[in-house]
Amino acid sequence: MNSYLLLPMVSLLTCIGQLCQKQAAQCWEQPQARRLNLTLRWLAIAVVSLGLGMLLWLRLLQQLPLSVAYPMLSFNFVLVTLAAQLFYGEKATLRHWLGVAAIMFGILLMSWHL
C-alpha cells in the first residue's frame, strides 16, 4: 500500500482511538449501573483503532525512514484538536492554533523531503 495513503490512515485511526478514550473517561459521569459497560465498550473500540493504527504504522515504517515518517505523525495534533472542538466543544486559544499552524508548516517541510 502507498505510504501517502498509509500515513493519513494511521493518523485517522490514532485520532479515533484518542476520541474513544476521551469518551470512555466521560462515561465515569454515568450512573454506576451503566458506567462499566459503557467504559469497556469505548475502550474496546479505542484498542481496536489504536491496534490497527499500529499495524499500519509498522507497514509504513517498511516504506519510509523513521526520521521522515515520525514527524509527519504530528498531523495527529491537528486532527485531535479539530475533533475535540467538533465533538466535545473544547476551545482552542490563538496560541494553540499558532502551535497547530507551526506543526502543519513542519509537515509541509517534511513532505518536500520525500
Swiss-Prot record:
Pathway: Bacterial outer membrane biogenesis; lipopolysaccharide biosynthesis. NCBIfam families: PRK15051.1. It comes from Yersinia pseudotuberculosis serotype O:3 (strain YPIII). Keywords: Cell inner membrane, Cell membrane, Lipid A biosynthesis, Lipid biosynthesis, Lipid metabolism, Lipopolysaccharide biosynthesis, Membrane, Transmembrane, Transmembrane helix, Transport. Residues 43-112 form the EamA domain. GO terms for cellular component: plasma membrane. One of its GO terms (molecular function) is carbohydrate derivative transmembrane transporter activity. It is a multi-pass membrane protein. This is Probable 4-amino-4-deoxy-L-arabinose-phosphoundecaprenol flippase subunit ArnE. HAMAP family: Flippase_ArnE. The lineage of its organism: Bacteria, Pseudomonadati, Pseudomonadota, Gammaproteobacteria, Enterobacterales. Translocates 4-amino-4-deoxy-L-arabinose-phosphoundecaprenol (alpha-L-Ara4N-phosphoundecaprenol) from the cytoplasmic to the periplasmic side of the inner membrane. It is found in: Cell inner membrane. The keyword Transport applies. GO terms for biological process: lipid A biosynthetic process; lipopolysaccharide biosynthetic process. The chain crosses the membrane at residues 38-58, 64-84, 94-114. PANTHER family: 4-AMINO-4-DEOXY-L-ARABINOSE-PHOSPHOUNDECAPRENOL FLIPPASE SUBUNIT ARNE-RELATED, SMR FAMILY PROTON-DEPENDENT DRUG EFFLUX TRANSPORTER SUGE. Heterodimer of ArnE and ArnF. Belongs to the ArnE family.
